[in-house]
Amino acid sequence: MVEPLLVLIAASTKLTVYTQDDPTFPESVPAIHDSDLAISWHHSIDTVPTLITVVNGQETDRTFGWSRADWQRLTGLDDLGEDLPVMRPGCGSMSVDPDRVDALRVAFTDTPIISRHVELSSAEDEFEAMYARGWTDGLPVIPPTPERVLRMLAGTTRAPQDVVAIAPPDLVELTVEKIAINAVMAGCLPEYLPWVIAALEAVCTDTFNMHGVLATTMPVGPVIICNGPGTRAIGMNSGINALGQGNRANNTIGRAVQLTIRNVGGGRPGEVDRATHGNPGKISFCFAEDELGSPFTSLGTERGIALGQNAVTVFAGEGPRCVVDQLARTADELTNSLVACLQTVHHPKLVIGFDAILIVSPDHGRLFAQEGWTREQLITQLIERSHTPGEQLVRGARGIAEGIPPHLRDATLPKFRPGGILLTYAGGGAGLFSSIVAGWANSAIGSDPVTRVVGS
């Protein structure tokens, strides 16, 4: 349909034709093959055909697709296309093809990416090359091409060179761009990036003490608890297998945090990371609280976040341990079971120096809901019921060398300090099980939980 029109236009005025996919089209009029789509990109062509009028090197008008009236007006040929339909919509330009647009943006715009580019030879397997360079957590990572990084950066309104934090242990400036690169490698979608940024803001604080979390020989790493309506918007899992595999957002947000600390901050196992055993959560340990199903106010609200805001809370924790109680029929009975299990955090005879997360499941949470227990009430009871006479805790008591100093024999001590239990709610709807995540040393000698609002 177009070629006869081009012949008529070329006969009446100066005409330059650019063709995208077929260099032999049109046969009747000379054409320039826009093989790299540079012309199409720079002229913002989103539909073909597009007809543009140019005067003194400046565009004066354009029309796209086929509109008989518009083509007649732009060419001054009043009878152009009289035998053709009045209008046809045209086709999408190759320059807006989703599979090409990111590469074109990199090729033809001033990219904000300033990180060093690493070129791999055609003989190198990119996945093996990244592993050999020490950029992975032992699992394959996604190659962070400029196209992918630009796409990731579109997930935040922050500028690529904004400094988010100083990343331990090497105390390197951590920019949005560096985070985006590692988020790509972890497998994140762009909409996850604000959550990764917020989590890294939190773990890089002196309060959280990421350097210490790495350097300790204990098996701890960042545990990331996400709150707010955004957790549902990005598809995070707070239900069945919330702490396990299978959910992209949960697993890649946590993984991006760990990869960033490794690749930017220098926190690598065998170097600053000195964990005796470590735990699988040091690859990723991230989940959402089930705020809609919870009988309690949310963890985010408890930590000062306004209702409806998105937030992350980071905690230096080990892997989860299961609490089994299938016989308790009252909140009081279940609380006693939870206390008995919490007493074993790190060691039954060590107290106050360690915090813990208690993840209450729906089946267990139902008992508290039926009796109207609040978050504050449950935490208070857990701490009060964890008090133990010092004579049972001192070194040597019960034939166990481990324990507290002898001068505390006559004291009665709680297992946890005030605020030492983070209560959250998640898990599948079936199973009379809850989970405990033991923490590292707390306060000035260790790590305290940190909460940050998730930005845009």
Language model features: what each stretch is:
Residues 1, 7, 44, 63-64:
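N-terminal functional module detector in eukaryotic proteins
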Residues 2-24:
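Conserved helix-turn-beta segment immediately C-terminal to the redox Cys motif
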Residues 23, 59, 232:
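Surface-exposed, flexible loop/turn segments at secondary-structure boundaries
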Residues 83-111:
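Long, low-complexity intrinsically disordered regions
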Residues 107-456:
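Non-transmembrane, aqueous-exposed alpha-helical and coiled segments at domain scale
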